[in-house]
């Protein structure tokens, strides 16, 4: 049987998957472990967490299949440590509660990026429904195209955050 991940199709997350992805901290753990497996200790250090707190989140991600445990290795002082790597499954999930956790993860990550290294823009639009759908489709196709390209382990890692939403800063238009 072919999984949605194998054919590149998004699917609705189960309740457990949606709960796992509803945490900005868990999304940051997935990002940290996307290209390099990290132990619980390394994850805790990278995020400034207590190792027990990190382990709680790691276990949730392992239980839902978003992280996989690799072969144990010897860490500092010969202790047995388990490295974890992101499975990439979260890309193929659609959740009704994911937007706030995505924003939470983005804000935490962008706060650590020096101002000159940020490339941000905002754009106000007025589009008819058909053009709005065209914009959504073209944005999705572009992002999916870059997602599907082979990852170059030697390339510098970058992050992309895209948000399209109704503009609530505009005053309502008056009727003629």
Residue spans of the language-model regions?
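A short acidic, leucine-rich amphipathic alpha-helix
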Residues: 42-48, 61
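Short hydrophobic beta-strand motif reused across regulatory alpha/beta modules
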Residues: 67-68
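Conserved segment of winged-helix/HTH DNA-binding domains
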Residues: 6-9, 14, 18-21, 64, ...
């Amino acid at each position: 049987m072919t999984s949605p991940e194998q054919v590149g199709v998004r699917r609705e997350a189960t309740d457990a998957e949606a709960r796992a992805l509803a945490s900005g901290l868990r999304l940051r753990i997935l990002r940290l472990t996307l290209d390099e497996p990290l132990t619980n200790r390394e994850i805790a250090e990278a995020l400034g967490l207590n190792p027990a707190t990190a382990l709680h989140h790691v276990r949730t991600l392992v239980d839902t299949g978003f992280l996989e445990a690799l072969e144990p290795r010897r860490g500092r002082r010969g202790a047995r440590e388990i490295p974890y790597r992101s499975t990439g499954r979260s890309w193929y999930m659609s959740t009704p509660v994911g937007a706030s956790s995505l924003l939470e993860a983005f804000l935490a990550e962008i706060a650590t990026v020096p101002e000159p290294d940020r490339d941000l823009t905002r754009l106000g639009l007025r589009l008819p429904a058909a053009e709005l759908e065209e914009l959504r489709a073209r944005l999705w196709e572009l992002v999916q195209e870059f997602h599907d390209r082979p990852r170059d382990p030697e390339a510098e890692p970058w992050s992309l955050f895209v948000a399209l939403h109704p503009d609530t800063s505009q005053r309502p238009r008056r009727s003629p």
